[in-house]
């Protein structure tokens, strides 16, 4: 669920998804095209690819079980879809944390019109 993903992002990065990631680069937020702009944007690209493999799941709204303890995100038991969505979100949130040192404020509200060219394949 998007709100759960936001909590994971906040836990890992200490930043709220909105405004820091919702419109970042070419892939953070809805959709995406072109080449990822940097490591943070690549985290979002990989997250989009992860969700893309779950076409039969309601990736944005399915509620899953997870815990935030001792500095770690742990996905809990649930349906196959819930567990897979949680893993996509967990991996992305951890990726965003690893990319904090190269986060660029200039990509925070990056216009889609500047995301041109062919998209990479997943």
UniProtKB/Swiss-Prot annotation:
One of its GO terms (molecular function) is toxin activity. It catalyses: a 1,2-diacyl-sn-glycero-3-phosphocholine + H2O = a 1-acyl-sn-glycero-3-phosphocholine + a fatty acid + H(+). Expressed by the venom gland. The lineage of its organism: Eukaryota, Metazoa, Chordata, Craniata, Vertebrata. Gene3D superfamilies: Phospholipase A2 domain. Its main location: secreted. The crotoxin heterodimer is inhibited by the crotoxin inhibitor from Crotalus serum (CICS). CICS neutralizes the lethal potency of crotoxin and inhibits its PLA2 activity. CICS only binds tightly to the CB subunit and induces the dissociation of the heterodimer. Tested on the CA2-CBd heterodimer. It holds the Pfam family Phospholip_A2_1. It comes from Crotalus durissus terrificus (South American rattlesnake). The active site is at residues 47, 89. Keywords: Blood coagulation cascade inhibiting toxin, Calcium, Disulfide bond, Hemostasis impairing toxin, Hydrolase, Ion channel impairing toxin, Metal-binding, Pharmaceutical, Secreted, Toxin. Binds 1 Ca(2+) ion. Its cofactor is Ca(2+). The record marks 30 as: Binds D-105 of CBa2, important for stability (T-31). It is found in: Secreted. It comes from the Eukaryota. Heterodimer CA-CB: Crotoxin is a potent presynaptic neurotoxin that possesses phospholipase A2 (PLA2) activity and exerts a lethal action by blocking neuromuscular transmission. It consists of a non-covalent association of a basic and weakly toxic PLA2 subunit (CBa2, CBb, CBc, or CBd), with a small acidic, non-enzymatic and non-toxic subunit (CA1, CA2, CA3 or CA4). The complex acts by binding to a specific 48-kDa protein (R48) receptor located on presynaptic membranes, forming a transient ternary complex CA-CB-R48, followed by dissociation of the CA-CB complex and release of the CA subunit. Monomer CBb: The basic subunit of crotoxin is a snake venom phospholipase A2 (PLA2) that exhibits weak neurotoxicity (10-fold less than the heterodimer) and strong anticoagulant effects by binding to factor Xa (F10) and inhibiting the prothrombinase activity. In addition, it shows the same effects described for the heterodimer and binds the nucleotide-binding domain (NBD1) of CFTR chloride channels and increases the channel current. PLA2 catalyzes the calcium-dependent hydrolysis of the 2-acyl groups in 3-sn-phosphoglycerides. It is an enzyme of class 3 (hydrolase). This is Phospholipase A2 crotoxin basic subunit CBb. Heterodimer of one of the acidic (CA1, CA2, CA3 or CA4) and one of the basic (CBa1, CBa2, CBb, CBc or CBd) subunits; non-covalently linked. The acidic subunit is non-toxic, without enzymatic activity and comprises 3 peptides that are cross-linked by 5 disulfide bridges. The basic subunit is toxic, has phospholipase A2 activity and is composed of a single chain.
